[in-house]
Amino acid sequence: MTQKRIIKLAFCLLTSIAGIGAYLYACGWFPPDWYVTNSAFSPEVTVPKGVYNSLFYSVEQSFNGYVGIDSDRYTEDDLADWCAYVGKAMPREQIRHLMYDGEAIDEVLQLKHSKKFTDKRVQNFLTFLEITRGNEVITGGSYYDPWDYENRNYQRLQNTEPQRVEALYRSLTSDAFFANRIWFQAVRLKFYSENRSSVIPFFEETAASQPKNSLYYRAMHYVAGAYIAEKHYPQANVLLAEIFDTTPELRTTVGYDYRPLPDREIAQIAQKLSPGVQCALWAMQGFYTNNEANYLLKILTIDRQSPHVEFLLTRFINKMEYKLNVFDRYGDDLKSIKAYHQHARKVSTQVFSTDWLLLLAREGNRFSNPYLWKVAGGYVA
């Protein structure tokens, strides 16, 4: 049987029971996740570490408790880049100190206007720091209490500051590394400015001349944020899908930024995208729609090697497991093994359909994570 026919058959097996499952879900009572459920299927073991962590299934809270703002995500990478650029002209620990220590901003300004460092690359580094550290009160959000939702008053940069940085970027012609960093700061400052939407045309005009490194996709994330602020969700979702597909370290963040739309709109949007970005788009759509199996199968029809099926498959298994473990969760007496097997049979045939999974598990070697498919198939068998 060909791969396409197998996936098509899996679709049929899934949809044949969809009505029953939807009815039981709509009429059932799903209590808050106040109790910890023991799991025999740990997604962080079967899926590459850190790639989808907070997108794994949890009923009332994020997987592993919460999602923090990982402000240190790029700290070491950015430090390494600047150390390589500056070379031996400035010690590594001084570079780290100037980039990240809270009280270093005054020192940056003093060094910038002194004659201690005459090396051109060090001067560029100090110019970069003058921009980033000089505006971090606003770009870093340190001026408000993140837990005070009632009295949050966002500050914005005056338009003159991003315009100044943009002018500096446009004047740079010979130093690609420095120009790329200043370009990113221009994008960033426009996002935090009084004219946030100005980041969109600037990115569209200049992005093609930039290397597609982490700064490129971080800049794209700001543009997606500007579209979200304008409620232009289709445009935002396209950018978020590209980031989700290309930048694993941002998948959790963009997954939460995504705004689900009706499937017909997503299908229209997806037609113009590359297969990888289409898969990412459907993966995020599946995260929000409570029907992981359907979107998982959509992805497999586009690219059977797509890694984005992985967190959807783990969510499907963990949701089913949550229904199976009612005895464990609430301390209900398990009157007999037979009663448990009857309950498990009902969950796996009426509340959830698993025939499609068993079918695809036999073909697991053809997918991106054969181990996950075999373990999932064995779990529901």
What are these model-derived regions, one by one?
Residues T2-A10:
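Bacterial N-terminal signal peptides that target proteins for export
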Residues A10-G19:
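Bacterial N-terminal signal peptides
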Residues A22-R188, S193-A381:
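Extracytoplasmic/secretory-pathway proteins
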